[in-house]
């Protein structure tokens, strides 16, 4: 049975860090729901807690208190092994930097998450080719990152993030290292992904990317101030 509730649900989440003798309150009582099929941009000034929130949604970090439920599963107290497996099969990540393996081709980079998930070589290659075609890089699948433009590298990174059919795509400043024209192309790709059913949560300072999302969540000083 498919869970019909929100794909992301946070309740009264706090995240504190020790900074020397001081405690930094990165998130202060955050509650948030993201519905399946939604496209949400988290916006706000630097240091307001956007990336900390995204790390909790992505099960990269755990809250100091509160609950985090992703795709119907409580994730706020998972072991490292459980969190790694959950991320591999449920969450795709896109970052400001592309983090592609320089010695591998575009196609080989896209196959990496599938290899970790133990898919057969033939399945991996077919899925990677399909994804590279989706992002407009069929003719570049044998090229290494050094032979690709920044926009092309980000498209490879997006294809890689989709490799294991994730329930949720998370992106942290995905247009941050791209020029305006290339950034616009990536924004259009995210809109197409969402139109095709992908649930997306992005953290961004890019006003155009935020405007393209269906909903904006505004943060300040570790709190959601508008949603």
Regions found by a protein language model. Give the residues of each.
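ABC family nucleotide-binding domain
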Residues: 5-219
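Conserved switch/coupling elements of ABC/ABC-like ATPase nucleotide-binding domains
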Residues: 221-227
